[in-house]
């Protein structure tokens, strides 16, 4: 696969925003895996996790920066962390590679872990129609709650959101249940997660099921902590791409 660093003009503020793009150099259009970096990192964060699977399954891979980390040390942190700027950067990057590269626009998949899981859910609440399937692993779903639950990250939440409860709510997936319900989405969360309590995923799922019981929202609570099981997550992605059939069980 060929790697390129691409710069895409933001349709909000016209700034040039970077993404990494790995593409197959064959002529036919390929499915696209969009990988989202975690809370404390940037576009380089998920190369090790996601590139081997893009190579294995023949996907192109897009790794957007979406204004960098959600840390107080990032001078752009108020435009990161689920802001409209960050969401639009991801959308702009997808639009760019669909228009200019060998990308199959009917088969775009989104994947994020931890802070990237938070952002995957924010995108499900922003433009669910862009994605054939979304995987969100150990996601934060309520920033205001998480600020109180994790002292190591509270100052970063405050820096990104300006210590504004309304802003935290705007940047929390729990606020976008009506739109998230339109997505084809699976949430993965470790039952014993010490970083982002499993209650984040449980509460979001509960809200979705009470209001939209027929939606294509799924939840996998696994035996583990704040971790990634790439095989399980990619099985979900591939099953939605290829229509993998499971064995029917009879009584």
Show the residue positions of the predicted features.
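N-terminal cap/lid segment of alpha/beta-hydrolase-fold proteins
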Residues: 1-27
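Short substrate-entry loop that stabilizes the transition state in hydrolases
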Residues: 29-30, 36-71
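Mobile cap/lid helix-loop segments that gate and shape the active-site cleft of serine hydrolases
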Residues: 45, 132, 139-176
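Glycine-rich "HGGG/HGxG" loop immediately N-terminal to the catalytic nucleophile
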Residues: 68-81
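Alpha/beta-hydrolase active-site loop
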Residues: 80-101
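Primarily recognizes the serine-hydrolase "nucleophile elbow" in alpha/beta-hydrolase
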Residues: 98-100, 106-149
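The feature captures the conserved acid-bearing segment of alpha/beta-hydrolase catalytic domains
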Residues: 159-200, 206
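C-terminal catalytic histidine-bearing segment of alpha/beta-hydrolase fold enzymes
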Residues: 202-251
